[in-house]
Amino acid sequence: MSATTGEWPPKSHENPDTALVVNEGVEQPPIINPYIKNFFKKKPALLSVEEYMAGITSGNTTILSQAITLVESNLPAHRDVAQKIIAACQEHTMKSGIQTMRIGITGVPGAGKSTFIEAFGSFITSKGHKLAVLAIDPSSEKSKGSILGDKTRMETLCNDPNAFIRPSPSAGSLGGVARKTRETVILCEAAGFDVIFIETVGVGQSETAVHSMSDFFLLLMLSGAGDDLQGIKRGIMEMSDMIAITKADGNNVEKASMARALYANALHLFPPTESTWVPTALTSSSVTKEGLPEILEKIEEYFTLVKGNGYYQSKRRQQAKFWMYESINEALKNSFYENPVIEKLIVDYEGAVLDGKLESFMAAGELLEKYRNLDK
């Protein structure tokens, strides 16, 4: 405070009663975190179904990504638009007469799945195909899914104009993730991608989901992984149309060749397939690219067979029927758990079960009964 005037700050920096020097201020723009600024920006309005379709069918991957985001959304308004886009995409693909190749890919840990997809995918696009890489990862809501990491490792495919990589949708249950992935397949096919890779993350329950939306199922194995045949479930081998022994390079060539022979013999022990295709085992290297042409050749041989004998079409029809029932199951489950009355009741019932006051099946029965009587 100035001793002479009692003002602060002093009007003159030359005031003898103070040693303070007050400089004139410089006007500064308000400091705003760019992230917060962008967060509050007005979100772009939804396009019309016709605009989405025009972008998708012209191969515009930006519009395709926006449409897939609607498919993955749980907002009712988004789902309504998404269902119309899916129906329009199905109609477009049917009219075009294009028969795509949906290839499910799974593998044991350490088989180098993302490296294989990078190498094999690049080889496929070099042959004039357009490739979409999708994933089914029910853990993606917690872990964000390994394909997010895979996408950063698939540098060549990411920069390939004939390739499109989409991370797994984040939805807590396997059923929700699988349904959204299947719908994404439909959009990608309408966008002109004639080869679709559907990747599973690890070897587990998601194989059945991938198999239910794939035409061809490829299992990646390592030589010596889990004592060879003991390291893989019989059911997954039975689903496989081909086994590829990866990392067949360097000092591992001989071991990979021995593993190939072992798996080839094992595949012949399974009953004949409905498609009449005889599953085979091959070796491959993502480093030397050895074996990749042979794998593609065998896959194309498979599609020639099943398109010729009608199995391709009948399997697609059976898959459509399967997903009709899966969609009903998913919708009923969501309707139950998202009901506000049930949301409140279920907490009390859960507590009663945990405290041992009520048996689980009785709690479930009472909750379902209350749910059925809500509209009465």
Residue map of PLM features:
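Alpha-helical scaffold elements adjacent to nucleotide-binding pockets in ATP/GTP-utilizing enzyme cores
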Residues: 147, 184, 209, 213, ...
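Non-catalytic terminal/linker segments enriched in charged/polar, low-complexity residues
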Residues: 1-95, 99, 343, 364, ...
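Long, well-ordered amphipathic alpha-helical subdomains in the mid-to-C-terminal portions
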Residues: 64-65, 283, 294-372
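Short beta-strand/turn micro-motifs at beta-sheet edges
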Residues: 152-153, 229-234, 269-273
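Short hinge/gating elements
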Residues: 49-53, 106, 111, 168, ...
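Canonical P-loop GTPase G-domain recognition
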Residues: 242, 248-305
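Nucleotide-state-sensitive switch-loop elements of NTP-binding domains
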Residues: 48-111, 115, 120-206, 213-220, ...
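Flexible active-site lid/hinge loop adjacent to a nucleotide/diphosphate
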Residues: 225-254
